[in-house]
């Protein structure tokens, strides 16, 4: 009986995971398109780099939520799900990871493909 319950549980989990992966996606865009996206005042701009990297220069209006911090998941949960999110990091790896987490939390996400290294716009320090 335990074996049957275990198999049913495992099958349910696999189907659930596959469905969520197939339907929850985010847009990865270049710097030009990212600039257009963040022109919308409703967009929440999230920088996933460390606080030190953030202080060296960030896109105006960005909020720092370090993906490697213990508070990352809690801070993402506090974001307004009725507003889109634009996320970036230094080169694109961390923001892709963050974007995957964010869409699984129910957020609409646009990610800057090559990070702030590709950004041609204004930077705040």
Predicted ranges, named:
Residues 2-4, 12, 17-32, 37, ...:
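Rhodanese-like catalytic fold shared by cysteine-dependent sulfurtransferases
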């Amino acid at each position: 009986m335990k074996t049957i319950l275990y198999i049913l549980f495992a099958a349910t989990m696999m189907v659930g995971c596959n469905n969520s992966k197939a339907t929850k996606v985010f847009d990865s865009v270049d710097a030009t398109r990212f600039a257009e996206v963040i022109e919308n005042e409703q967009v929440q701009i999230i920088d996933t780099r460390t606080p030190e990297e953030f202080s060296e220069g960030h896109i105006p209006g960005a909020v720092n939520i370090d993906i490697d911090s213990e508070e990352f998941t809690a801070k993402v949960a506090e974001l307004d799900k009725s507003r889109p999110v634009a996320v970036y990091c230094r080169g694109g790896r961390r923001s892709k990871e963050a974007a995957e987490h964010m869409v699984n939390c129910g957020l609409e996400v646009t990610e800057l493909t090559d990070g702030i290294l590709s950004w041609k716009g204004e930077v705040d320090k």
